[in-house]
Amino acid sequence: MAGKSPLINLNNGVKMPALGLGVFAASAEETASAIASAISSGYRLIDTARSYNNEAQVGEGIRNSGVDRAEMFVTTKLFNCDYGYERALRAFDESLGRLGLDYVDLYLLHWPTKDWNATIQSWKAAEKILGDGRARAIGVCNFLEDQLDELIAASDVVPAVNQIELHPYFAQKPLLAKNRALGIVTEAWSPIGGAINDGDGDNHGGRKHPLTDPVITTIAEAHGRSAAQVILRWHFQNDVVAIPKSVNPERIAKNIDVFDFALSDAEMAQLDELDTGVRIGPDPRDVDTSSFAEFV
């Protein structure tokens, strides 16, 4: 079957699906099964990373899918421990080897690090990989506004994508606007979001979750959709690429079934008002080349 997701244009003319499957923290067995379910459900964007330890299963799943490689959009990422020009080039070769592919569609720097020179040198390596045709586009993850400015000032290529934590409870409106102004597509990791402290000890032990938030569930009921589908549609209408992670075949299928309904301006505004400004993941200013060593 054909891919279900609309395509968006990156700043170098490459087309990228507007929704894909993330495989963070999925085991090898879970990844293989999830890839099969996703592709059969119409996904064409798969997002992995060196630190996820499942690149091999992603590549195997794509090869076994029966879908032409040219129809797929594969993203992987350079991890912090491999930063530096030569190390980044070697790490990319290793990722390609694990994937069993000749090229990736998008190669991302996973984090900005306190060792800014290593970050810049890694980006220079990504520029070479792009120039050699082994990545169709390059980008970054978790870069803040000033970090984007510094990177661009020291580089020849403007990132095509900035993949960031973004969900209704952490909407990052200023960074989203910055990305747009620079011609950078925003991609959301953890697009559904997770539980946050809400200050009400009588409500879920002082925590709430987007999937049970009454604002979201009320909108979902009005459309006959799930809360997750409403959130993913909110991303799409904000021109944000979402990569929800799931290993459940039913949820995988539902997550991409969001392109045949629309949220009203009032509903979009209601969802926007849920922003707490509270980050669930790490602060991009506190990450170094040795951060998250337990993942590799």
UniProtKB/Swiss-Prot annotation:
Pathway terms, separated by semicolons: Alkaloid degradation; codeine degradation; Alkaloid degradation; morphine degradation
EC number: 1.1.1.218
Chain residues that bind substrate: 110
One GO BP annotation of this record: morphine catabolic process
Ion transport keyword on record: no
Cross-referenced Pfam families: Aldo_ket_red (PF00248)
Enzyme class, first EC level, given as a word: oxidoreductase
The protein's name: Morphine 6-dehydrogenase
Gene it is expressed from: morA
